[in-house]
């Protein structure tokens, strides 16, 4: 077998292991993460309700408030990516939710390329091709925050814990790990939102984002 075939086999085995370990413990895990009953449920519920209020405030802001550059703002307001985020509730395994997270990110890039590509004529006889304006990580995060704020996930906080804390470590590599970090950063921004300052990262020049206590 080639290296790619071994990698696919290993990943399939890890997914199977996750399914066998997570499903039997799913109810307990959700209770521990705040989706069930038990000690501390009231406090967790208050924290989540506070977060959802802040998320609604962020969702009410235009793209420009989050310092999404005009060259990156979406005329469709990233509806395709938001719809993908909404579908995350249809999955239970952490790896499945993480896979949706990666698809959301790819959809953002695809939407950007489709909506902001510039016609560029190639060599002799070449037909015009769409050349999207490059999007750096600093450009991506505000868009991701916008999408997260406007999606309809039942519990962003529980989703964050499932992806970041219960997923098999070996699966948290590459794109999955990167966008899980983006999710953490987006939640941190929303949790620290005060409705006044634009604090996605560029305003202070530090490039940092707020951290979340959730």
Where are these regions (language model features)?
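C-terminal regulatory/linker segments that are acidic, Ser/Thr- and Pro-rich
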Residues: 180-214
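Extended serine/threonine-enriched, polar tracts that run as long, contiguous segments within proteins
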Residues: 88-156
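Eukaryote-specific, cytoplasm-facing alpha-helical/coiled-coil scaffolding segments in long proteins
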Residues: 44-62, 125-128, 139-147, 166-177, ...
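Intrinsically disordered, low-complexity regions enriched in proline, serine, glycine
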Residues: 33-34, 114-118, 156-158, 172-176, ...
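Catalytic and GAP-homology cores of small GTPase regulators
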Residues: 1-109, 115, 119, 178
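Short, hydrophobic/amphipathic alpha-helical patches that form generic packing surfaces
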Residues: 20-27, 141-151, 158-165, 185
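Short alpha-helical "patches" and their helix-cap loops
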Residues: 37-45, 156-169
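Acidic, serine/threonine-rich, charge-biased low-complexity segments
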Residues: 1-10, 121-127, 206-214
């Amino acid at each position: 077998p080639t290296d790619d075939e071994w990698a696919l086999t290993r990943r399939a085995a890890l997914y199977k292991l996750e399914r066998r370990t997570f499903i039997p413990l799913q109810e307990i895990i959700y209770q521990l993460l705040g989706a069930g009953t038990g000690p501390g449920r009231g406090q967790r519920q208050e924290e989540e309700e506070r977060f959802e209020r802040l998320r609604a405030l962020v969702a009410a802001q235009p793209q420009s408030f989050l310092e999404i550059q005009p060259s990156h703002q979406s005329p469709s307001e990233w509806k395709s990516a938001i719809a993908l985020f909404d579908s995350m509730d249809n999955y239970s395994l952490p790896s499945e939710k993480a896979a949706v997270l990666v698809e959301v990110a790819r959809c953002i890039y695809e939407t950007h390329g489709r909506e902001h590509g510039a016609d560029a004529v190639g060599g002799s006889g070449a037909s015009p091709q769409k050349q999207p304006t490059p999007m750096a990580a600093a450009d991506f995060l505000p868009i991701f925050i916008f999408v997260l704020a406007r999606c309809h996930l039942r519990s962003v906080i529980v989703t964050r814990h499932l992806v970041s804390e219960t997923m098999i470590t070996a699966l948290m590599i590459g794109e999955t790990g990167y966008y899980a970090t983006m999710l953490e950063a987006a939640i941190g921004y929303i949790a620290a939102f005060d409705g006044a300052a634009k604090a996605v990262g560029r305003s202070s020049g530090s490039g940092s984002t707020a951290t979340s206590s959730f």
